[in-house]
């Protein structure tokens, strides 16, 4: 599991934010708000979507000082279009709304393709980080229902609908950025990957 708010991934996120003038942060899958304090300090505006009311309650309790955070309760595939209408420029997206097999949800939920299609339909050049890449690089094992999770080719097809984007899988994260930021991702990969 990646942690957007911890180094080295947070370093990449902040470098992308600087290079791309990303003032806004959008998270799907709030859980209990572990990344919200970091995001509230690093970005002007923050949106977070959580489907579980108890997790959202805990996230709010864990981040009482985060005044620039907007909390949305519901399915990210339905809530994300509302956020897209609020954006005035490119944003950093942390997509982590997938769950299942009794982990964070009773049944498998994986809105990733719908999320990608929504974000990439925007006229802005957003940067996207997707947590838990291992669940997409190969079918998730039982007790997950792999049929509810997109295959890697489905993810690539969603990204390919928006020409000019690059996708990399490293450190359990899918990194999807405009080609002009590819060098930043390459430097991140060079720094953290094992030698070949």
Regions found by a protein language model. Name each.
Residues 1-92, 98-196:
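A short alpha-helical cap/connector motif
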């Amino acid at each position: 599991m990646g942690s957007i708010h911890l180094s080295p991934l947070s370093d990449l996120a902040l470098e992308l934010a600087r290079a791309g003038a990303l003032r806004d942060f959008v998270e799907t899958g709030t859980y209990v708000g572990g990344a919200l304090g970091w995001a509230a300090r690093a970005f002007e505006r923050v949106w977070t979507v959580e489907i579980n009311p108890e997790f959202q309650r805990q996230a709010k309790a864990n981040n009482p000082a985060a005044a620039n955070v907007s909390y949305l309760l519901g399915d990210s595939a339905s809530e994300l279009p509302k956020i897209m209408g609020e954006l005035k420029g490119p944003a950093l997206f942390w997509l982590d709304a997938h769950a299942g097999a009794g982990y964070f949800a009773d049944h498998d939920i994986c809105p990733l393709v719908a999320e990608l299609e929504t974000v990439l339909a925007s006229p802005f050049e957003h940067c996207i980080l997707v947590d838990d890449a291992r669940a997409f690089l190969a079918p998730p094992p039982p007790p997950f229902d792999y049929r509810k999770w997109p295959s890697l080719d489905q993810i690539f097809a969603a990204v390919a609908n928006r020409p000019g984007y690059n996708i990399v899988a490293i450190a359990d994260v899918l990194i999807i950025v405009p080609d002009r930021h590819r060098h930043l991702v390459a430097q991140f990969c060079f720094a953290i990957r094992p030698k070949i």
